[in-house]
């Protein structure tokens, strides 16, 4: 299999030399980190032009990650979407269970090139942490993962996985005790230990070069999916759909389709209990431009410019910022961003589980809910591509509590009977 990683960007889509996508991006960091961030940028530029780097990354993607990931049509699920055809890009089938391994392997190789011996990372749902711990075990690197205390509780399985892989997991007890605060602590660690440490940033946010670099490592998703759907459906999709927190899985899918003007790029943000309640993390829906974690982008903030606390049932989407390229795509009208509530996402999770035998991550379920609505808009001639960014093993405790699956057997069976009747009725 040839490399899908360093294909030249379509003209005009790379950031400026200063890392800007239009008005968004840049590098807003303390002086103590300037040299380290500049080193990452220089080494990444060298790696992009080094065939040996691309070959090593490609070998890992194929023989370790298991790429290319499958493209799966889900006709029974699609019956609930107005009959539009729906295909899932199965990033959930990657080693470690999500898209996160794509970026992690690339940055782990870069860490080796820089001669660093220690890696730190933030994680929300735990998938980036698990992928980072996996790569560190593979390459013999010391690993510390920062995770909000609330997220360590709702993602206890992934905490155990990280520790099994040899990582130190630090529960962050400051602020909202979620992803934003984990990133803050990771930056503090990097300042204190910059000589031997690389911060393996997990999304397309942060200071330049991280938004472009993380995107580049994930763009294989869209490159593969574009080729696969042309082979399977004979044409490009009407829409490419992905969940959006920081935005890495979404930009990985979208990027290959940006030049295809007939393909709508639809990002599904977490509306939580409803955007109108204030309890959400729908940054592009309700945010304003500001500075967060080293770059300028849309952020959730109050009238005084202070970052507000986000909320989502999904730990991986519970973030008050967004990658700067998404902000640019929103402003120029190339990207569409919709807000999906907790309830809509959870119903989509259960529907996919019971119609197709695939249990998605709660993050991915936001995209599935968006696809259901989009399918009803497009009708039976519609063709939708959804990035299934991760599997739902990590979310089973949350799902079980949400749906009452820990209740008595009789209650569970009654719930299942009700669902089957609803599904059969909708399909008629």
From Swiss-Prot:
CDD domains: Trp-synth_B
Cofactor(s), names only, from the UniProt record: pyridoxal 5'-phosphate
Matching Gene3D superfamilies: 3.40.50.1100
Reaction equations catalysed: (1S,2R)-1-C-(indol-3-yl)glycerol 3-phosphate + L-serine = D-glyceraldehyde 3-phosphate + L-tryptophan + H2O
InterPro entries documented for this protein: Trp_synth_b_CS, Trp_synth_beta, Trp_synth_beta/beta-like, TrpB-like_PALP, TrpB-like_PALP_sf
Keywords: Amino-acid biosynthesis, Aromatic amino acid biosynthesis, Lyase, Pyridoxal phosphate, Tryptophan biosynthesis
GO cellular component terms, A-Z: cytoplasm
Positions of modified residues (N6-(pyridoxal phosphate)lysine): 100
UniProt pathway annotation: Amino-acid biosynthesis; L-tryptophan biosynthesis; L-tryptophan from chorismate: step 5/5
Record has Calcium as a keyword: no
Enzyme Commission identifier(s): 4.2.1.20
Example GO molecular function: tryptophan synthase activity
Subunit structure, as described in the record: Tetramer of two alpha and two beta chains.
Role summary: The beta subunit is responsible for the synthesis of L-tryptophan from indole and L-serine.
Stated family: Belongs to the TrpB family.
Record protein name field: Tryptophan synthase beta chain
Gene: trpB
